[in-house]
């Protein structure tokens, strides 16, 4: 893998690398990155991988190469501005709803804010990073009291604390480093949205690449609610002398009325009253922006800057939604009243086009993950990131690359794909059990047959079970059943405590079950006897009412493709592969992946899904599986 990555850097061809758990893929791209003659950016999806790179892999690599002549071992971590404490906000105060700077909130929240402020000042004194990940325990709401978004920031030259700023110092370190570690979202903002966030680079490694399209979609999703517009109007009232801020507040009322008349879910055709309300908000926000007093030289005021930023955000989101672009999907999302009530959301219908035009044409990109071959092939993932299957060339190039699907003016983007395998012998270490005898899952959650099956399997394994469920309700129902019928085991459900605490309990006591939803499907690494059974209640297709997925599926059908296979089955295959990957994490692990959904072996699409999984020995016989689990449990002790 290291040789192929280095070759890709040198010849400028894009590369997809499937590298199974345990192959050491991070070192396989970090070594060529250190040896490359220009800066390399590594983008990850999760904080856990960033921590692994920065706290484990890179220090070991630097120690190994520090005496090599002509090799730069410098590296830096770069995140979005809101991930760093803001010294201006900490020292000058936070704007309230009227834009007045308030020192500290009252009550217990005020005490926690003071703790965060003290931590940030200590970081500033000791040349710390001021990163959120290193801060004392806090909520999102608390963190907003000590941080700002990029739009709210005064800017280095206009801020009294610009030279001390944690975010600016992180950018300075990145500009002096050979290697920049960042995340998918920041990469998207820099490369696709064209907002310069990362120092100049020509090569990108996208790790956890199976996540990249979802993360880029997330970064390009905008939200707008009545509360957002009202808040922006209230903050603007202190700075705008005319009626423009009041007009914006009136527009919020029109939006509230139009939202109340609309239905939850995807909006294919914007109703006239909602379209009118969005235009009203857009125009009122534009007028309000024009009414803000101009800032003079050295006349920086955080309250004014942040009030204006709020109005600018409302304008941008309303303008995008009112445009009703075919390239966007609009929907109404219903939140609890305490969390703000209904909101409008807009997201790109697809991201492969922007990725191809804005990232792949300008940079050399290496995509890597343990899960890149879906249905046994790279084509699905390649297409999702903007590379055409017809542009793939053999690992050893032969002849000229020809893409017959490209027009005369369209640039061909050749790429290679390699699977470097796995150190694990899945055929001997793992069993895939499909409960063919069970009824297909219904809409009413887990039935008696599924609950009986879960209890029997968990009993045979004597705990040691990670349950991956399609909904929080299903996870909690299963947990209640196992607790009632197997009281000698410890059964934990997601939500009982914070995920790190649940994971710690799961590891410490082998006679434990941990049941949860999506964050457990991809974020848990538990090698050893702790986890010998991974339960999956149903094939994880997206919900039929998911606005974005359903729109993408319909668009694929309309373009002559198979929307179900291209969108729903691909989504399910990716999650199934990730979920199954929780079982075998080392060469000594053994266990069972149990799928309680018979469609994996009875439906036509089952072959595609199975081809996306590790090559485990497969059975549909429950007696065989229970005996295997009992043997594993007795040998584990």
Which residue ranges define each predicted feature?
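A contiguous, basic/glycine-rich beta-loop/short-helix subdomain that forms a polymer-engagement track
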Residues: 144-178, 193-195, 288-436, 445-452, ...
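A substrate-engagement module of RecA-like helicase motors
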Residues: 21, 38-178, 283, 290-293, ...
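Conserved RecA-like P-loop NTPase helicase motor core
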Residues: 423, 435-445, 496-601
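Conserved helicase motor "Helicase C" RecA-like lobe of SF1/SF2 P-loop NTPases
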Residues: 470-495
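Conserved pre-motif I regulatory segment
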Residues: 1-17
């Amino acid at each position: 893998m290291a040789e192929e990555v280095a070759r890709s850097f040198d010849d400028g061809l894009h590369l997809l690398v499937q590298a199974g758990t345990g192959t050491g893929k991070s070192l396989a791209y970090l070594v060529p990155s250190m040896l490359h003659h220009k800066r390399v950016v590594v983008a990850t999806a999760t904080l856990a991988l960033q921590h692994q790179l920065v706290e484990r892999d890179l220090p070991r690599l630097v120690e190994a190469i520090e005496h090599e002549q002509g090799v730069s071992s410098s590296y830096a971590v770069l995140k979005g501005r809101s991930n760093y404490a803001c010294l201006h906000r900490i020292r000058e105060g936070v704007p309230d709803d009227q834009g007045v700077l308030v020192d500290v909130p009252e009550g217990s929240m005020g005490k926690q804010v003071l703790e965060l402020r003290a931590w940030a000042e200590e970081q500033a004194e000791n040349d710390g990073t001021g990163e959120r990940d290193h801060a004392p325990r806090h909520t999102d709401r608390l963190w907003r009291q000590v941080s700002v978004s990029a739009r709210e920031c005064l800017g280095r030259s206009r801020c009294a604390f610009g030279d001390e700023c944690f975010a600016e110092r992180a950018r300075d370190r990145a500009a002096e480093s050979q290697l920049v570690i960042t995340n998918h979202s920041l990469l998207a903002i820099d490369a696709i949205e064209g907002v310069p966030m990362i120092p100049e680079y020509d090569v990108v490694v996208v790790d956890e690449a199976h996540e990249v399209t979802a993360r880029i979609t997330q970064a390009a999703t905008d939200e707008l609610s009545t509360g957002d517009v009202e808040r922006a109007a209230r903050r603007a009232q202190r700075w705008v002398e005319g009626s423009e801020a009041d007009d914006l507040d009136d527009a919020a009322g029109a939006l509230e009325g139009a939202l109340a008349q609309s239905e939850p879910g995807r909006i294919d055709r914007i109703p006239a009253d909602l379209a009118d309300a969005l235009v009203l908000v857009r125009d009122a926000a534009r007028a309000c922006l024009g009414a803000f007093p101009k800032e003079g030289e050295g006349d920086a005021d955080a309250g004014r800057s942040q009030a204006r930023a709020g109005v600018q955000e409302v304008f941008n989101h309303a303008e995008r939604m009112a445009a009703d672009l075919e390239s966007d999907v609009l929907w109404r999302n219903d939140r609890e009243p305490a969390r703000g009530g209904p909101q409008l959301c807009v997201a790109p219908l697809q991201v492969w086009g922007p990725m191809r035009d804005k990232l792949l044409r300008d940079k050399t990109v290496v995509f890597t993950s343990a899960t890149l071959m879906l249905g046994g092939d790279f084509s699905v993932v390649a297409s999702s990131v903007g590379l055409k299957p017809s542009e793939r060339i053999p690992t050893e190039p032969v002849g000229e690359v020809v893409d017959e699907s490209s027009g005369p003016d369209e640039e061909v983007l050749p790429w290679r794909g390699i699977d470097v395998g796995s150190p694990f012998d899945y055929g001997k270490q793992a069993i895939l059990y499909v409960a063919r005898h069970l009824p297909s899952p219904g809409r009413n959650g887990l039935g008696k047959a599924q609950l009986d099956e879960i209890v029997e399997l968990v009993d045979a394994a004597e705990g040691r079970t990670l349950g991956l469920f399609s909904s929080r309700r299903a996870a909690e129902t299963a947990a209640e059943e196992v607790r009632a019928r197997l009281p000698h085991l410890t059964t934990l459900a997601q939500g009982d405590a914070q995920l790190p605490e649940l994971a710690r309990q799961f590891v410490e006591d082998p006679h434990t079950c941990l049941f949860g939803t999506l964050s457990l499907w991809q974020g848990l690494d538990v090698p050893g006897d702790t986890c010998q059974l991974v339960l999956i209640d149903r094939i994880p297709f997206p919900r039929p009412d998911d606005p974005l997925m359903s729109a993408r599926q319909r668009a694929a059908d309309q373009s002559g493709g198979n929307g179900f296979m291209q969108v729903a089955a691909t989504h399910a295959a990716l999650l199934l592969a990730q979920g199954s990957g929780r079982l075998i994490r080392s060469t000594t692990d053994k266990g069972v992946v149990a799928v309680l959904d018979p469609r994996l072996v009875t439906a036509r699409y089952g072959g595609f899904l199975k081809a996306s999984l590790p090559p485990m020995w497969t059975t549909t016989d429950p007696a065989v599986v229970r005996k295997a689990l009992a043997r594993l449990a007795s040998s584990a002790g």
